Structures are given as C-alpha cells and as structure tokens.
C-alpha cells in the first residue's frame, strides 16, 4: 500500500488539493503498478508563519500560493 505524504503551505483550494491527490494516486498506479484503491495520500498544511525560506518566514512574502483564493 503506497502512502504518499505531501507538506504544503496552507492556502490552496479544496479543488487544487483534490486534483493533487488524484494526480499523485494516478502516478503511483502508473509507476508502481499499485491498485488504485491501495494508494493513500496525506496532505499536511503548514501555516506560512511556520515555513521558512532563506531565513525568512514565508508569511513575510508578498505573494500567496499560485492557486490560492487570497
């Protein structure tokens, strides 16, 4: 049973996360030969203030995630 874990900065739409889950599931089926029903995907969302890039919290950045409604 493949288990795929993804960590993202919060702010993406439910539609974007559903599309990601579908795409990752299909990739596991295609590349690993895993039965679709055995693939698990976990998305963990992290607040931007808890995600640092180059020593700066991502919350300090001016642009939201590309698919964000913000």
UniProtKB/Swiss-Prot annotation:
Domain of life of the native organism: Bacteria
InterPro entries noted in UniProt: 4-OT, 4-OT-like_dom, Tautomerase/MIF_sf
Entry EC no(s): 5.3.2.-
TM spans (from-to): none
Example GO molecular function: isomerase activity
Keywords of this entry: Isomerase, Plasmid
Active site (UniProt): 2
Family under the similarity heading: Belongs to the 4-oxalocrotonate tautomerase family.
Protein name: Probable tautomerase RSp0893
Organism from which the protein derives: Ralstonia nicotianae (strain ATCC BAA-1114 / GMI1000) (Ralstonia solanacearum)
């Amino acid at each position: 049973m493949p288990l795929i874990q993804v960590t993202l900065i919060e702010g993406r739409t439910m539609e974007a996360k559903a599309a990601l889950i579908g795409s990752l599931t299909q990739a596991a089926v295609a590349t690993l030969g895993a039965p679709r029903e055995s693939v698990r995907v976990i998305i963990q969302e992290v607040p931007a203030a808890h995600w640092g890039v180059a020593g700066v919290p991502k919350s300090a950045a001016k642009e939201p995630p590309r698919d964000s409604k913000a």
